[in-house]
Amino acid sequence: MLLIYDFLSLVFGSIVILTGHPKEFAVTLVIAFVLAGLGWYGAANYSKLWNLQFRTTATHAILCLVATILTFVFVVLFVSFKYTQEAAESSIEAWGSGVVKDDAFLESVAQRGYDEVKKLGIEDFSKPTLHGGYPIEKPESKKKNAEVFASSTIEYFIHNHPFLSKIVWSKETVPQQTVERIVARIIQFFDSKQESLPAKIEVQFAVDELKPLLREGAIRVVPIARGIIVALFLLVQLLPFGLIGWAAWRDLKVTV
């Protein structure tokens, strides 16, 4: 369900951006109306290619209306999808702002970092810390702490944006080099620290490193989104055109 919601959020985001360009939106509506009219004409008359005597019924008129509406919606979506990259980047920015304000997530990732570092058994947890964190004096601890925050931040993005994440990374799993790159930068940033800082700061650093990678992958959103909508349009249009064509063919058999 989240996958569909994430896709629809990109769809609506793209439409909103399109409406922010009044002239382009107006031209799009004109083209959509024209093509929708052609869609009506095509659905109502294409069956006469093999059955000149066929007359559409009220049911067929409804199917023609469906084909018309689908054509109109398709044109608007297809044009608006030129802005899906911009919509995706807005989603990435919103995610980046939201993740550092999600107290439940920050608490869970801090606890996970504490547990993972403590499991290593190489730090003295009896020492007091200045920021209420946990000791990360050893290189192994720094690496483990960075891995926890990097992977947790990525998992948060994947959970909240399942559709977008599949496009950004184009694989079932996040490329290992992406994780390693974030880990390396976190370690570099905290190399002079002897303890963990508040989870919000560490997550923010992971977000800052991850956002450019996400924006880079977001370039693929436009062709993929348009490919999906074209495939859906053709698939769904088979219903009205197929039913009308089948009715005309059946009527031809009865007449003969």
Report the location of each language-model feature.
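Membrane-embedded alpha-helical segments of integral membrane proteins
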Residues: 2-50
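Long, solvent-exposed extracytoplasmic domains/loops
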Residues: 93-213
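Short, aromatic-rich amphipathic segments at membrane interfaces
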Residues: 8-22, 195-235
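Juxtamembrane interface at the cytosolic side of transmembrane helices
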Residues: 34-67, 222-256
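Membrane-embedded hydrophobic alpha-helical segments
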Residues: 61-71, 181-182, 186, 190
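Transmembrane signal-anchor/signal-peptide helices with a preference for the extracytoplasmic
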Residues: 44-46, 70-101
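Aromatic-enriched hydrophobic runs in primary sequence
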Residues: 3-22, 97-108, 133, 184, ...
